[in-house]
Amino acid sequence: RLAHIFISHLHGDHCFGLPGLISTLGMLGRTGGLVVHGPKEVETYLRPVMDLFCRGMEFEVRFNPVDTRSHSLVMEDRSLSVYSIPLKHRIPTCGYLFAEKPKEAHIIREMTDFYQVPVRCMKDIKQGQDYVTPEGEVVPNSRLTRPAAPPKRYAFCSDTAYNRSIIPIIEGADLLYHEATFAECDLARAKETFHSTARQAAEIARDAHVKRLVIGHYSARYEDLSELHREAEAVFPGTILG
């Protein structure tokens, strides 16, 4: 079922596993195509590796270069749109915003049976139209349908320095994953390496009014993550450790 892979940037911890995954999919007999989205350098890195280790596969791997400097549509299908989020890191990097498309209303079968609604009218009713009976009675759409669940939005932001310019893009997201590589005591190191602290991640979440925050991408120097969790929780209660 995997059809799309989204790569943020060309640092090893974000892309070294890709050749092995593609090779494994080939060995498992995959035949459907696969699209890899990411900075244009991703194809430069992956093509020679695939030529060596992924020959003879029964499926095509396509590359979709993403402009890491702009907020733009990356891909969409019937149910989902994916947008790039320009991030601030040492090399070209982008996050991704995954936005569900609104779903059609749910038919209340008991009511459509009661009013003997023809099958040919169901599509229009799902899209919000009222139903007019052969006798001319107007049946409100609200009597025939239940609203679908609101569409959800998920933002993935890693790796990045503290970058308030992403706030309008992720405003109100249902879930934000934001890197939190360092604690505040290592703020200077965070600035030097273009990473964020846990507190900074929480400030972004708070000011963007997201519903939930997951932090991750911790430096290996922290054996105990409780300090990072406390710093984020102080700004954004309910922060989840990823």
Task: Give, region by region, the residue ranges found by the protein language model.
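Active-site metal-binding motif and surrounding structural segment of the metallo-beta-lactamase
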Residues: 1-37, 65-67
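Active-site neighborhood of phospho(di)ester-bond hydrolases with catalytic His/Asp-centered motifs
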Residues: 2-11, 39, 154-160, 177-179, ...
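An N-terminally biased module of ancient metal coordination in phosphate/nucleic-acid-related enzymes
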Residues: 7, 21, 195, 222-223
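Metal-dependent catalytic neighborhoods of phosphoester/phosphodiester hydrolases
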Residues: 17-24, 223-231
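Short, well-ordered alpha-helices that flank and scaffold nucleotide-derived cofactor binding pockets
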Residues: 23, 48-51, 203
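Arginine/glycine-rich "motif VI" loop of SF2 helicases in the C-terminal RecA-like domain
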Residues: 25-31, 51-58
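A glycine-rich helix N-cap at a beta->alpha junction
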Residues: 53-66, 238
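Metal-dependent phosphodiesterase/nuclease catalytic metal-binding core
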Residues: 67-215, 226-230, 235
